[in-house]
């Protein structure tokens, strides 16, 4: 059990939310109304209520999001709108923040829980762990078959082996049905991550060298 209160300011995990307004599938989704407030503010409030002990930053792609968040009292780091992924945005933001451990919560994830955040914080604070993510067992066959739900195959120690939108793993046994003990139900990838600073630096360096 890790006591985050006893960790130093430099080693205690922080939360960075990568926030991109120029979404291709849903432009300005993060500013869409969610019960009277922008979606990104709902996410921010949820994170703050669930994990108030963690410093929270938003890595934004422009001044519009920056103004909305700062007006509501949240910290932001301005990053290039041309960055291709949330991990790129977090890595660039952490070049400025220089934190040892970073938890990545998606900007459109207003249902994130304290357990999610603490699980990632514990995992990334362990020795020899450079990146961690979350997965949960599928509860229904319809979700398992849904291509919009990302699946992950794990080894016996919980390490991710393979990600896919296809229903994996699948038993070859003809008599296997959903929920049958012979059928592996599969895990849903939850899209939450944690990284250490060394991994984020390596991530950026590897891109710059290609």
Where are these regions (language model features)?
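N-terminal glycine-rich phosphate-binding loop and ensuing alpha1 helix
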Residues: 11-60
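Residues that recognize and position ribonucleotide moieties
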Residues: 24, 110, 193
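Short phosphate-binding loop-to-helix
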Residues: 57, 63-122
């Amino acid at each position: 059990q890790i006591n985050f209160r006893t960790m130093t300011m430099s080693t205690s995990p922080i939360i960075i939310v990568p926030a991109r307004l120029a979404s291709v599938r849903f432009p300005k989704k993060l500013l869409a109304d969610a019960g009277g407030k922008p979606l990104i503010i709902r996410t921010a409030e949820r994170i703050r209520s669930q994990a108030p002990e963690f410093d929270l930053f938003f890595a934004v792609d422009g001044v519009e999001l920056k103004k909305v968040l700062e007006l509501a009292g949240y910290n932001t780091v301005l990053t290039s709108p041309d960055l291709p992924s949330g991990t790129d945005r977090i890595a660039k933001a952490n070049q400025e923040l220089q934190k040892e451990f970073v938890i990545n919560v998606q900007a459109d994830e207003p249902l994130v829980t304290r357990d999610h955040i603490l699980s990632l914080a514990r995992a990334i604070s362990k020795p020899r762990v450079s990146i961690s993510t979350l997965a949960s067992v599928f509860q229904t066959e319809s979700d398992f078959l849904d291509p919009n739900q990302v699946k992950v195959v794990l080894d016996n120690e919980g390490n991710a082996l393979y990600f896919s939108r296809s229903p994996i793993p699948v038993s070859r046994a003809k008599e296997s049905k959903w929920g049958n003990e012979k059928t592996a139900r599969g895990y849903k990838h939850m899209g939450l991550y944690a990284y250490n600073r060394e991994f984020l630096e390596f991530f950026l360096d590897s891109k710059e060298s290609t």
